[in-house]
Amino acid sequence: MKRTLGGTTRKRQKTSGFRARMRTASGRRVLSARRRRGRHRLAV
């Protein structure tokens, strides 16, 4: 039997998507830190 370790897109977006990050102050801090660092992708 196969394991369910594929990961679900909905869960991933809900927890670490761009809009999820924008929702909280700490999430916005994460985004600004990633911008400062020059990350190509800000969120998942």
From Swiss-Prot:
Region Disordered: start-end pairs: 1-44
UniProt KW keywords: Ribonucleoprotein, Ribosomal protein
InterPro entries (alphabetical): Ribosomal_bL34, Ribosomal_bL34_CS
GO molecular function, a single term: structural constituent of ribosome
Biased composition (Basic residues): 1-14, 31-44
Gene3D superfamilies: 1.10.287.3980
Pfam families membership: Ribosomal_L34
Entry GO terms, CC: ribonucleoprotein complex; ribosome
Gene Ontology terms: biological process: translation
Family per record: Belongs to the bacterial ribosomal protein bL34 family.
Protein name per Swiss-Prot or TrEMBL: Large ribosomal subunit protein bL34
